Amino acid sequence: MGSRKCGGCLSCLLIPLALWSIIVNILLYFPNGQTSYASSNKLTNYVWYFEGICFSGIMMLIVTTVLLVLENNNNYKCCQSENCSKKYVTLLSIIFSSLGIAFSGYCLVISALGLVQGPYCRTLDGWEYAFEGTAGRFLTDSSIWIQCLEPAHVVEWNIILFSILITLSGLQVIICLIRVVMQLSKILCGSYSVIFQPGII
């Protein structure tokens, strides 16, 4: 009972993280609050991977919904035996928590790549990735940010928002990983038997 309540609390934490991921990803389409750059496709290419909107956002909301349903006491009657039902619920919980790790992990990786690549901006040489060849060193050298002439403050905009996405998706990965460990501990530590019985399956 205690582990189930704990699992439900962890699942609930995923909801605000997913909603914030959607909001932050949407903001990446509007550097400095302007819409013209999205319509003219003058944004960093990693924005178009929809890492925050789709994977760390919508897909995580779906995963969270399933996990919360599985935590409901009334959903332990999927077969004749209560023990059998618990086994299937545990298995499904592990599967969907693992999917959560995959979805949020995707957002984490893409956001990190977007952060290291730097923004797509207008320089004296035209529109380009001004810091693409710096291997992320520009992140700690604010003196070279002036190379980006347009959009205004786009370097800060990208750094802040991609960093937030990395944090949000990282927390999602941790929460889903904890859920997997909790469910596996039920099996390995013998909270209930997971030996399949021929007469049940």
Curated annotation (Swiss-Prot):
Positions in the Extracellular compartment: 31-49, 115-157
Subcellular location: Membrane
Keyword Nucleus (UniProt): no
Primary localization: membrane
Residue ranges, Cytoplasmic side: 1-9, 71-93, 179-201
TM helices/strands, residue ranges: 10-30, 50-70, 94-114, 158-178
GO cellular component: membrane
Membrane among keywords: yes
Domain of life: Eukaryota
S-S bridge residues: none
Keyword set, alphabetical order: Membrane, Transmembrane, Transmembrane helix
Membrane topology (UniProt): Multi-pass membrane protein
Family named by the database record: Belongs to the L6 tetraspanin family.
Annotated protein name in UniProt: Transmembrane 4 L6 family member 18
Organism: Homo sapiens (Human)
